[in-house]
């Protein structure tokens, strides 16, 4: 089992790295789904240190395997976001679990909220595997503009993972 090392993206150069990888893998639009053609500035807005914490996950060879970012929501709850890069996707269960453990160890969080487009079935599967509760439907919650439909909104799902229900030791 791979053990990932998490580094806080606390400089502009570190915060830029995930977007460069997203672009090279052709997944920037899937990750930054509220923009028709996401650019670096859109990504930097997502991980702006004024309202987000961002960590980079590196594998044993120090290659960037993924990124996780957290927006504090209310009190001790944060909205969590993941991006797992191609080389690490076969290990998504392990990487996601380690990312969640890292978040709970790095911040005094009572729970994590995840919100995603309902048609992203792989995210629904991942949320279930990582221990998030049953997803609830949020009608038209995800602004996903298209070139010809700039106001398009799609249904979203949301789920919660409470610290007390997550085994940090596993």
What annotation goes with each model-predicted range?
Residues 27-31:
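Residue-level signal for secondary-structure boundary elements
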Residues 32-51:
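Active-site rim helix/loop that mediates acceptor-substrate recognition in acyltransferases
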Residues 1-17, 21, 26, 51-88, ...:
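Acyl-donor (CoA/ACP) binding surface of acyl/acetyltransferases
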């Amino acid at each position: 089992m791979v053990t990932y090392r998490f580094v806080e993206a606390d400089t502009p150069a570190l915060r830029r790295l995930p977007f460069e990888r997203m672009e090279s893998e052709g997944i920037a639009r899937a990750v930054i789904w509220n923009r028709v053609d996401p650019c670096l500035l859109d990504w930097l807005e997502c991980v702006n240190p004024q309202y987000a914490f961002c960590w980079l996950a590196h594998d044993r060879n120090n290659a960037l395997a993924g990124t996780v970012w957290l927006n504090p929501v209310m009190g001790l709850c944060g909205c969590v976001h993941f991006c797992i890069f191609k080389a690490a996707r076969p290990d998504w269960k392990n990487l996601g679990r380690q990312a969640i453990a890292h978040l709970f160890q790095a911040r005094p969080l009572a729970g994590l909220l995840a919100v995603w487009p309902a048609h992203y079935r792989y995210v629904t599967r991942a949320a279930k595997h990582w221990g998030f509760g049953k997803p609830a439907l949020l009608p038209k919650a995800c602004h996903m503009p298209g070139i010809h439909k700039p106001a398009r909104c799609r249904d979203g799902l949301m789920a919660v993972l409470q610290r007390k229900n997550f085994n940090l030791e596993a």
